[in-house]
Amino acid sequence: MNWSNLDDALTAQKVFSDLFFDSSKMSDKQREESLKTLVLALHSEATGIVEAVNYKDHRCADEPVDQSKILYKAVDAYRYILAILNLWGIDGNNFAAALSQKDDFLHYRHKVSGRQWGGQPVALFDMDDVLANFRKSFCEWSSKKCGHFIDPESDEYYNVREFKKIGVNSEGYFKEFMDGHGLVSLERDEQYIGLLNHLKTQGYWIQIITSRPASELACFYDTYTWLRKNNIDADGVAFAAEKFIWLSKQPYYSGGKYFAIDDSAKHSAEYAKHGVKVLVPEKSYNKEVKGLANVVYVPHGEDPIKFIPEI
């Protein structure tokens, strides 16, 4: 057995775990109880790693670091992690993909965490259907799944009507789309990414603000994977269901120069109502904000850069 290969390591650990329990015959409740036991054991082994070094600062005498203990306690901890993955049927490919996503997040967060707003003008970019073409991809995926055409050009923001016709919960579909990592493969909107890059060259602070649910971890990490994969050079990334409230808590809200780019009629109207200029790309579902004070409505296909002087 090759322990340096993740799939082989999972298989080898399962052979040992099967001596004690058969996870395939467990109920979810039994799995939960088994998980508690494994996590407590993992905690014990992780604590054992610390015991290999001089972690008690109040002790005057230092003992030699026990590298052998570090190694073998790390092995024990790793095997408990393998057992946890086996318990819930998480295979090597899924785990490796999650590792890659986490790596994207950590690198992107590290890049932006060292940046601080220094008084420059701010552009607040929405993601879905501004930088990334979410609606088209989601409707195509949904149509294929349910066998019923879900029109991306519906005048409804949440497109509920078409889902109701076939007795489908659109939120359930959305979660399944997210859990299947559909957000990673969204197409770029080259015009609005071009706008972002243009504003960056003009000295703007680029803030990504999305109403995607950060509590859904596949969604959260896929957002960073998409940003990194598509070379989106933002200065900050935020997840907020109420975007104006989020904005009102930022250091540039009082006295700074800023504007937003958002396709949602709800968020655009909220921004505009509170005196924030907002660039709104024309969509089938946001006609009601056209003509509102503080809204610059960009006709479909037009280069948004041309409308910056109106901001």
What is each residue range found by the language model?
Residues 1-119:
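Flexible "arm" and connector segments at domain edges
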Residues 86, 197-200, 228, 272:
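Anion (oxyanion) recognition and catalysis
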Residues 119-172:
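Active-site neighborhood of HAD-like aspartate-dependent phosphohydrolases
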Residues 175, 179-209, 215-224:
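Short, acidic loop-to-helix structural element flanking the phosphoryl-transfer center
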Residues 209-214, 224-246:
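A short, structured active-site edge motif that brings together acidic residues
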Residues 237-241, 294-306:
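Short acidic-hydrophobic, aromatic-tinged amphipathic segments that line or gate anion-handling sites
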Residues 240-272:
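Conserved Lys-Pro-Asp/Glu-containing loop-to-beta segment of HAD-superfamily phosphomonoesterases
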Residues 260-299:
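Acidic, Mg2+-coordinating phosphoryl-transfer loop and its flanking beta/alpha structural elements
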